Amino acid sequence: MLRRFHLFALALMLFGAAGLSRHTFAQTTQPAQTAQPAVPTPTPELKVDKKVQPVTGKDAKTPTAEQVVETVIIVYGGGGGRDTLKQIRRNGVERGKVTRTANDGRVEELSYEQRFVRGETAGKDKIRVDQKMPTMEYALVFNEGRIWGIINGTAFTPKQDVTAEFLSQSQHGIDALLRYKENGSTVAFVGKEKLKGLDLWVIDLTDKDKSRTRYYISANPDIRKTARVLWLEYEETPPEASAPSKYRRTFHDYRYSQNTLVPFRSVLYRDDKQVQEARVQTVTYGIKMDESFFQNPEAAAN
């Protein structure tokens, strides 16, 4: 009930009373929720950055970049915005399956378990992704800027392409937009477009390494659909290539997990060819995390 009230209040700020008159905010059937072992955290009162107001009815056509992004942050925080995301998503565990298509057309499926602890910035995060394939199991660990792999309890240096893919997921992801201020990134409003019948805000994010990601965000006046990242695009030169490739990641099956918005399915395209599909099965935030998960076995032994 609290979340519905907060989102209704947000709708008033987003599009004004006139915009709401065209929509009926009746109770809607939500997608079936994946069973969550943790008790959902209550959504705090709606808080808005006083320096940057979210998009309102009067400026919905020509908002600033910060207005759009701050609106996205409010929506993904279930109405509580940045404070809710920091409180609930400070750590967690995500489990799911990934289907990959190799350059030679081979398709492989793996299951994964990702544990994370958020730092003040993305560079200070701790992330561990355990991956299980039919023929092997291994983990990749990011700990405050350092990356290594673990297989059978022994540390190893991942291949360059594996490291690049691992880093790209956080550098060019939704979290990079939600944490743009903490990471010292800049955002620019490209424009409002209509693509594939969708009203979109287009935002460019440039991080401190000058890497750019373009986000296509729903500008639908319906509060149940607005301010969601529908897809993003970026260019990157793979380690084995001499020219950059164009990547596009699309996001689907949005659900609320502990009062924060999560896409449970994403698809990655490289030069318009699908190379990866990820499906989240469960995600739980606010779990006490053992530091040993993020330690290098060799360093721990010494």
Where are these regions (language model features)?
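N-terminal mature ectodomain segment of secretory-pathway/periplasmic proteins
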Residues: 48-155, 184-194
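N-terminal propeptides/low-complexity segments immediately following signal peptides
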Residues: 27-48
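Gly/Pro-enriched, hydrophobic low-complexity segments
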Residues: 196-298
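C-terminal segment of classical bacterial N-terminal signal peptides
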Residues: 15-25
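Bacterial N-terminal signal peptides that target proteins for export
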Residues: 1-10, 21
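Short, surface-exposed beta-strand/loop "edge" segments at domain boundaries and coil↔beta transitions
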Residues: 102-108, 135-140, 155-158, 210-214, ...
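Short amphipathic beta-strand/extended segments with alternating polar/hydrophobic composition
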Residues: 109-113, 140-144, 156-164, 216-217, ...
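Flexible, processing/modification-adjacent segments and terminal tails
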Residues: 41-43, 54-56, 60-68, 73-77, ...
